[in-house]
């Protein structure tokens, strides 16, 4: 039973795009913490994840703080932002990941690792599928090597539908985060595997015209700003600080 859960990573673990009723973002890590808090007294949760962070900064900045905070459970998901960059260096990225995970495990901290899913049916990321496949494969290997809990989304097709994704087509929707949390809880051994087959009514597929309209809106609202930041060497996380930098209690949110 864990009493001090710390989340590390980028926008996925920060919770984009799952709005919290009280403001900011909730996300799968908050949802996981909310559930764990009901199973033990004096449960505490912190979250150091910041959107846009690449592997180097996650490991160099977040891991040392994590070690000082002395959690008994850490979740980490990282590497996608590296895979999206032109200067993708897979060997260096994985070596850095292994270093960070080994530091946590050396302190006997339980680690939950997320291996990202197959973007084959998600057109916006299909172009980097080979990179993400490599990242997934190596992440799974690290989880086994260091005896970590693992959520492996690669073989799961349940998240292919648009309903699980936000308008930016990169981050999960609130529903997507809900099922990601269920996957995490299953990996931790405190929930069943029903997340693999979401039994929810799916909306009808949009018409061709609606899809083209959404494509244009996505291009203007998300793709262009993202490209501009890349050209300018900026990150969406510049100037931001962690949303929960210290351990504190967390209460379940009524969905």
List the predicted regions and their residue ranges.
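Short glycine-enriched, charge-decorated loop/helix-capping segments at active-site entrances
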Residues: 18-23, 88-91, 126-130, 166-167
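Oxyanion-hole/transition-state-stabilizing segment in secreted/luminal serine hydrolases
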Residues: 14-18, 41, 55-92, 118-119, ...
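Conserved catalytic region of serine esterases and O-acyltransferases that act on ester linkages
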Residues: 1, 145, 168-171, 175-255
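Active-site segments of SGNH/GDSL-like serine hydrolases
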Residues: 77, 81, 103-133, 154-161
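A structural motif corresponding to the C-terminal end of an alpha-helix
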Residues: 36-40, 100-112, 138-150, 187
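Charged helix-capping and loop-helix junction motifs
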Residues: 90-98, 129-136
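Serine-esterase "nucleophile elbow" of acetyl-processing enzymes
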Residues: 1-51, 63-70
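Substrate-gating cap/lid alpha-helix
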Residues: 121-154, 174-177
